[in-house]
Amino acid sequence: MNLNKYIDHTLLKPQATEEDIKKICKEAKEYNFASVCVNTCYTSLVSKELEGTDVTTCVVVGFPLGATTTETKAFEAKQAIEQGAGEVDMVINVGALKSKKYDYVKKDIEAVVEAAKGKALVKVILENCLLEKEEIVKACELSKEAGADFVKTSTGFSTGGAKVEDVKLMRETVGPDMGVKASGAVRTKEDAEAVIAAGANRIGASSSIAIVEGTKSENAGY
C-alpha cells in the first residue's frame, strides 16, 4: 500500500522554528505527502515553500483547545486561506458539546465552513480522548450537518490520540462521502494501515517518513 498521499506531514510544536518548518516542507515535497500541517503563523512560509507542487498547505484553527470564539476561528481560517491554506483543521468546542449546546457547536463549525467555502477543505477535530462514544457520534453528525469535509480524531496535544475503534465508529457515523482523519499516536506503518483499514482516508503524523519507510519513529505524541 502506498501511504504517502494519505499523510498530512505535521509540525505543531510551539518551539518549532522557521528552519524546522522549511525542513518538513522539503520532506513533504520529497515524499509527495498530501499536505504540510502547521500553526497559522506559518501559513505564508509553507505556501511559499510548497509553491508549484501538489502538496497542500494545511493549518490548524482554534488549536489545540477549541475554546476560542466562533468569530475568532472564522477569522483565523479566512486569513490563513488568503495566505494560501488549502485545508483547515479546526478544533470543535468540546465544552459546548459536553454541555449539549449542539446548536452552538454546529454554528461554530458552520462559520469556518463558510469562511472556507470553495477555497479550502475543512476538517473538524473532535478530541475523542475527552469524549464518550455517544458524544463522538453526535460530534460527527453535527460536523456532517455543518458541511465539513472531514472529521478528525485528535489534536495530539491532549490525553490520547487515534484509536482504531474510534476511527471505525466515525466512519460508520459519517458514511462513505465524508473524510475521516486519524491523528495522534499514528507512528508506524502498521499503525497507519490499521487506521486505514478502520476507515481513515487521511493521517496526521509527525513520524511520516518512518511510516512510509516502515522504520522506527523517534517522535512521541503526534
Curated annotation (Swiss-Prot):
SUPFAM superfamilies noted in UniProt: Aldolase
Superkingdom, taxonomy of origin: Bacteria
Pathway membership: Carbohydrate degradation; 2-deoxy-D-ribose 1-phosphate degradation; D-glyceraldehyde 3-phosphate and acetaldehyde from 2-deoxy-alpha-D-ribose 1-phosphate: step 2/2
Main location: cytoplasm
One GO term of the biological process aspect: carbohydrate catabolic process
Class of the enzyme per the UniProt entry, highest EC level: lyase
GO CC entries: cytoplasm
Annotated localization: Cytoplasm
Record's keyword annotation contains tRNA processing: no
Active site: 89 (proton donor/acceptor), 152 (schiff-base intermediate with acetaldehyde), 181 (proton donor/acceptor)
Keyword set, alphabetical order: Cytoplasm, Lyase, Schiff base
Listed GO MF terms: deoxyribose-phosphate aldolase activity
Transmembrane intervals: none
Reaction(s) this enzyme catalyzes, per UniProt: 2-deoxy-D-ribose 5-phosphate = D-glyceraldehyde 3-phosphate + acetaldehyde
E.C. designation(s): 4.1.2.4
Family assignment from sequence similarity: Belongs to the DeoC/FbaB aldolase family. DeoC type 1 subfamily.
Role according to the record: Catalyzes a reversible aldol reaction between acetaldehyde and D-glyceraldehyde 3-phosphate to generate 2-deoxy-D-ribose 5-phosphate.
NCBIfam families membership: deoC (TIGR00126)
Official protein name in the record: Deoxyribose-phosphate aldolase
Lineage: Bacteria, Bacillati, Bacillota, Clostridia, Eubacteriales
